[in-house]
A protein has these predicted regions:
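Residue-level recognition of hydrophobic positions within alpha-helical transmembrane segments
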Residues: 11, 77-80, 124
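Short, structurally constrained coil/turn elements
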Residues: 15, 32, 69, 114-116
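N-terminal active-site segment of His-dependent metallophosphoesterases
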Residues: 21-100
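Positively charged n-region of N-terminal signal peptides that target proteins for export
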Residues: 1-5
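Extended active-site neighborhood of metal-dependent phosphoesterases/phosphodiesterases
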Residues: 88-165
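Bacterial N-terminal signal peptides
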Residues: 9-16
């Protein structure tokens, strides 16, 4: 190879360093300044039941936290089924590889990003009760989402009932 080819190869290598540099993604924004956004997070149990999927749910709530101002987000609604099974001690690997406790912790960890920043409403679903299939009303939701958890709830929380025993 002659000098010209070496110089060309060097320039291309240096140039790729600058071309592949990551930039912060373009933030979504509202077209009407008077508008606001409400975010819906449906059925996250598919994210919490496998350890490999848990970071995906955390990315969703991170995106919400990072978009509060640009999208004028006023609240988040999660439609329930935070976990696949409320009281599973030994996962079968097919319907998840996380115990119920690990699933509840993953859901709680994802929502921590919104605590103190944004009010959110989490509805419990049938997967959040009982041992496997909502055969009783036992639910670990109050253990991971106590009423005192998010200071943004103070203006909107009306009542909290005890867990059915």
């Amino acid at each position: 190879m002659n000098r010209k080819n070496y110089l060309l190869a060097f320039i291309l290598c240096v140039q790729t360093l600058f071309v592949s540099a990551q930039v912060y993604p373009v933030r979504a924004k509202l077209t009407d300044e008077k508008s606001f956004s409400m975010i819906l997070l449906p059925d996250p149990q598919s994210y919490t039941k496998f350890d490999a999927n848990q970071p995906l749910f955390e990315l969703q709530t991170a995106w919400v936290a990072n978009s509060i101002e640009s999208l004028n987000i006023k609240g988040v609604l999660c439609t329930g089924d935070l976990v696949e099974q409320n009281e599973i001690r030994i996962p079968d690997g097919v319907n998840g590889n996380q115990t119920s406790e690990e699933q509840w912790r993953a859901a709680s960890r994802a929502f921590e990003r919104l605590d103190g920043k944004l009010p959110y409403v989490i509805c419990t679903g049938n997967h959040d009760y009982g041992y496997q299939k909502a055969e009783n009303r036992l639910c670990h939701f109050p253990d991971y989402f106590p009423a005192e958890r998010n200071s943004c709830w103070r203006k909107s929380l009306v009542a909290v009932g005890n867990n059915y025993q």
